[in-house]
Structure formats: C-alpha cells, structure tokens
C-alpha cells in the first residue's frame, strides 16, 4: 500500500474512532439529563446541537474519506451524492455557526447587568434552541443549490470549475458561479470567526478581571456560581482556539494554492483533513472541560474496572459521591 494512502487512512480512521464515540457520549448524556432532571441549561443545549452537527460531518464526509483511502470506489449513486454533499455543507456550516453562537452566548452571560445586556441574557438563554432551529432552516435554504450542482463521478469530461469530492463532483459550470461560491464560503467563515475572536477577547478580559476581584471569596454561594460560569468560559475559549487554529491552517494552505499553476491533489486532501478535524477533536475538549460529562465518564470507567480489580486483588471498593464529584475509596 502506498505510504501516503496508508497515512491518510490512519488519519481519517483516528478521526472516526475519536469523533463518533465522543459526540455520541455528549448527546446521550445530555439527553439523559433532560429526561431525568426535566431541564437542560442553554449552554448544554448548544453543546448537544454542536455534537449533533459534528456527528453529521463525520458521517457525511470523514467516513467516506476513510473508505476512499482504503481503496473502495464508486460507492455512491446520483441521489446519494446529492444527499451526502448537501448534508456535509449544512452540517459543517451548523458546526461553525453553533460554535460562534456558543462563544457569543458565553460573552453575553459575562457582560455587565445593564438593561440591554440583561434583556439579551434572558432572551438568548430562553430561546437558544429556537435560534439554532432558525440557523438550521437558513442554512438549508442557502445550501439547497448544492443539490443541483452535485453529481456522481462520471468518466465524461467535466467543466474546469468542478470540485472533485471523493465519490462525487460539484460542477459550477461557469467561473462566476465558482468564484461567488468560494467568496461566500470565505466571507461566512471570516464573519463567524471574527465573532468568535471578539467574544473570546472579551471573555479573556473578564476572566482576568474576575481573578483580581474574587480572590478569597470562592467559598461563598455567589463565588461558586461565578466560578462555574468562568470554568465554562475557559472551555469556550479552548473550543474557539481549536477552530481558529484549524481555520488558519486551512486558509493559509488555500491562499498558497491560489499561487500555484498546478495544485497537487494531496494538498486538497490535507485541507479536508484540517477542516474535518474540528468535528472529531472538539468533543474531547467539551468532555474534559464540562464537569457533568467528565464526572460521568470517570464514574462509567470506575464502574467498569472496579469489579475486575476487586476479584483479582481481593479488595473491596465503593463509589460514593461527595460534593457532586465521583470519588473512589
């Protein structure tokens, strides 16, 4: 097997085995919280929908990249190609949009309690799911054109303005439609990334102010609530940083490719890997920075391993909860 194909297969395989269990774990745990506690915090609603969008990205793009890397060809027919490309476009845009919404929501939560900010806090928190639904409907309508331009790969000659997407082609036919599409993608990403960065800058500034003002009072109820909010803020900053890094690498390669008279197909594969990585890597950050998910994962691991240890070593273990954290005695 060609070393490059082997490396590509390993890379996309790792994204699949990390991304699917990670996103599924987030979705299942928050659904259980909703069923048991009858409510779900707005931030957790946003995280659930982000994990759902990430999962769709994996199923509509990363898995097919893996199958192509191991040598499987001609898997999709015409209608399946249209569905796959449409799903990928919408879900990837949803992933970016929801991450931007998450950073803006956290920024609003940390804003001063003025009349305007208090109104925004109330409305955004109460209507987080509605905002996501509106975003989804908007993106579905915006990307409906992909159904018309997407086709199963054929042996016939296509136009020079065709994107070759694994088993499918997206033929824009004219230079104008090709450049308009590329410009739209770039502007969309720039706007959302700018919102993420501005929100994160404000969050970082607020965190620094918080560190100076609340030292020594974390034991109070207000301090505990504030501490939870700022821990959530750090998680948002990490997610934004991850996306901005991947976005920067992807677009740096894209700008470089524009300067070349001939673009090696392998470079486009690397760009696909970078743009898809967020869907698989972001669940790791969400789980390790969310206390509820992190404690549940620890408890599940302890529950699975303790009986075996008890049998082998003749020891008795018990799991108890103290201060809302799982501990092993």
Predicted regions and their residues:
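Transmembrane helical core of 7TM receptor-like proteins
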Residues: 1-329
């Amino acid at each position: 097997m060609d070393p490059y194909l082997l490396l590509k297969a390993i890379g996309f395989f790792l994204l699949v085995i990390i991304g699917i269990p990670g996103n599924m774990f987030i979705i299942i745990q928050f659904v259980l919280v909703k069923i048991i506690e009858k409510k779900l915090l707005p931030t957790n609603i946003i995280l659930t929908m982000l994990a759902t969008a990430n999962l769709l990205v994996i199923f509509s793009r990363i898995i097919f990249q893996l199958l192509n890397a191991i040598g499987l060809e001609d898997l999709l027919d015409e209608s399946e190609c249209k569905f796959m490309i449409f799903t990928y476009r919408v879900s990837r845009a949803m992933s970016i949009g929801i991450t931007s919404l998450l950073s803006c929501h956290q920024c609003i939560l940390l804003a001063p309690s003025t009349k305007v900010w208090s109104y925004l806090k109330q409305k955004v928190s109460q209507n987080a799911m509605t905002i996501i639904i509106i975003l989804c409907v908007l993106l579905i309508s915006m990307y409906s054109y992909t159904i018309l331009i997407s086709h199963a790969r054929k042996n016939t000659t296509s136009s020079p303005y065709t994107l070759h997407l694994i088993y499918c082609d997206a033929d824009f036919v004219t230079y104008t439609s090709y450049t308009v599409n590329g410009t739209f993608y770039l502007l969309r990403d720039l706007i959302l990334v700018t919102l993420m960065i501005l929100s994160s800058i404000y969050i970082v500034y607020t965190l620094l102010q918080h560190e100076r003002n609340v030292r020594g009072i974390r034991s109070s109820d207000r301090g505990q609530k504030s501490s939870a909010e700022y821990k959530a803020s750090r998680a948002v900053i990490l997610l934004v940083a991850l996306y901005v890094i991947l976005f920067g690498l992807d677009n740096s390669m894209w700008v470089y490719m524009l300067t070349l008279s001939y673009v090696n197909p392998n470079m486009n594969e690397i760009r696909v890997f970078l743009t898809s990585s967020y869907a698989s890597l972001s669940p790791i950050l969400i789980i390790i920075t969310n206390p509820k998910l992190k404690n549940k994962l620890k408890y599940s691991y302890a529950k699975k391993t303790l009986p075996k240890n008890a049998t082998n070593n003749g020891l008795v273990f018990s799991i108890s909860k103290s201060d809302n954290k799982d501990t092993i005695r």
